[in-house]
Design a protein with these regions (language model features):
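Catalytic alpha/beta core domains of metabolic enzymes, predominantly
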Residues: 171-308
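Short acidic, glycine/serine/threonine-rich loops at helix termini
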Residues: 39-41, 64-66, 129-133, 160-167, ...
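Active-site beta-loop-alpha junctions enriched in small/polar residues
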Residues: 30-34, 58, 122-126, 153-157, ...
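N- or domain-start disorder-to-order transition segments that initiate the globular core
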Residues: 2-40
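Flexible, acidic glycine-rich loops studded with aromatic residues
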Residues: 269-375
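Generic structural signal for well-ordered alpha-helices
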Residues: 42, 93-104, 133-137, 162, ...
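Active-site beta->alpha loop and helix N-cap motifs at the rims of alpha/beta catalytic domains
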Residues: 59-61, 66-161, 167
Length: 380
């Protein structure tokens, strides 16, 4: 059974608790698996300061393929004549419902700000607006819990689906954001959705959203391009793109959620769409293991963390506001990258395509494995 690491000697409150209480940043767990629900591990994470859970098709694929905890339910569904893909959604929905129950006290005590768990629409719908809208609506109705986000990718086709779902009162986690331009579109979709609800006289207070801005993958891609750039200044720019871009995203967040337009919505009960820092594990072993936590601390944000990063942060992470302490420096880094021939918009497009493809492949591989398992059950 996985156990949360103890706090350092002499500590009375975990760093995760302090991160929220002192800095206003909510730490979430980037993993969901049925054994964690059954053996109490998720509850332990929550007691230690975790305030939400994220998952994606790769996480669900790893959870279902790597555990026998799903076998009995899957066998029962197949025996009922359910299609394999429909059986998958039943497995995933069951985990999300159970996780939402564990997190419900956090949701209630935070006034609906935290305590969320996410479930993503099928990855093959990432380039289909109408199908995404239909699938998101079905997931929302199927799970029917106030503290569940439906995840929609921030593709060009996903943007209008986000506005549509927000307008219908569905809380959305927008995922796979890799560029500032796309982030601007995500915020605009959220505001348009709220304005559509306001025009109908509908409640705005119950609609929540986070914008999942991916971090470490940006450095991985940019560092690779810097290695081949031939620019003599390139080595000094390695490992700087992701944090700089995320800090500029936070500035956009601050700008867009102030002013007359936002204040009109806020007066009707609307809540800000918080930036969620995703992909915050360190991919490059040369970088500190808490790099993408320590450097992005600030109020009204979320950081979703895999277990190893949680352990590292609890052991030696910092608790100092860092997201906007050097505002001019972030823009200067992107200027230097542009001078070195790095096109950040192209980086964003590349990573979006890779992210969509990776989730699609994970989902396809899982369905292949489940079909094989269903075939084995049919032979018994």
């Amino acid at each position: 059974m996985t156990r949360f690491p103890p706090a350092p000697v002499g500590a009375t409150v975990s760093r995760l608790h302090r991160l929220y209480r002192e800095q206003g940043q909510s730490p979430w767990l980037d993993n969901l698996t049925r054994p964690y629900l059954r053996d109490g591990t998720l509850a332990e994470f929550v007691a230690a300061g975790i305030r939400g859970v994220t998952a994606n098709p790769t996480i669900f694929a790893r959870a279902i393929a790597g555990s026998d905890a799903y076998d009995a339910q899957f066998a029962a569904l197949i025996a009922q004549g359910r299609a394999v893909e429909d059986a998958y959604w039943e497995l995933a929905a069951a985990d999300v419902v159970d996780a939402a129950a564990v997190l419900r006290p956090v949701y209630d005590t935070s006034g609906g700000t935290d305590g969320f768990v996410s479930i993503e629409v099928a990855p093959e719908l990432a380039r289909d607006t109408d199908a995404t809208i239909a699938a998101a609506g079905r997931l929302h109705e199927r799970i029917a819990r106030p503290n569940v986000f439906v995840k929609i990718p921030a593709t060009a086709e996903g943007i209008p689906a986000i506005a549509d779902m927000i307008g219908k009162g569905v809380s959305i986690n927008i995922t796979l954001i890799f560029s500032l331009a796309r982030y601007e579109q995500v915020i605009e979709a959220y505001l348009q959705g709220l304005e559509a609800r306001a025009a109908r006289g509908a409640d705005l207070a119950a609609v929540r959203s986070v914008a999942s801005f991916f971090v470490s993958r940006v450095d991985t891609e940019v560092d690779k391009r810097l290695e081949h750039s031939g620019d003599p200044e390139a080595p000094a720019l390695r490992g700087r793109a992701a944090i700089a871009q995320a800090r500029l995203a936070y500035r956009i967040f601050q700008d867009r959620f102030t002013g007359t337009r936002w204040e009109t919505l806020a007066a009707r009960g609307a809540r800000v769409q918080r930036p969620l820092w995703a992909s915050t594990s360190t991919k490059n072993p040369d970088y500190p293991d808490t790099r993408y936590v320590d450097s992005l601390i600030g109020p009204d944000t979320v950081n979703t963390l895999p277990e190893a990063t949680i352990t590292a942060f609890e052991d030696h992470g910092t608790l100092t506001r860092s997201i906007d302490t050097v505002p001019a420096g972030a823009a200067a880094v992107l200027d230097e990258l542009a001078a070195a021939g790095i096109d950040m918009d192209d980086v964003g497009r590349t990573l979006e395509d890779q992210g969509v493809a990776a989730f699609h492949q994970s989902f396809a591989d899982l369905l292949t494995e489940l079909r094989a398992k269903a075939h084995q059950l049919a032979q018994r």
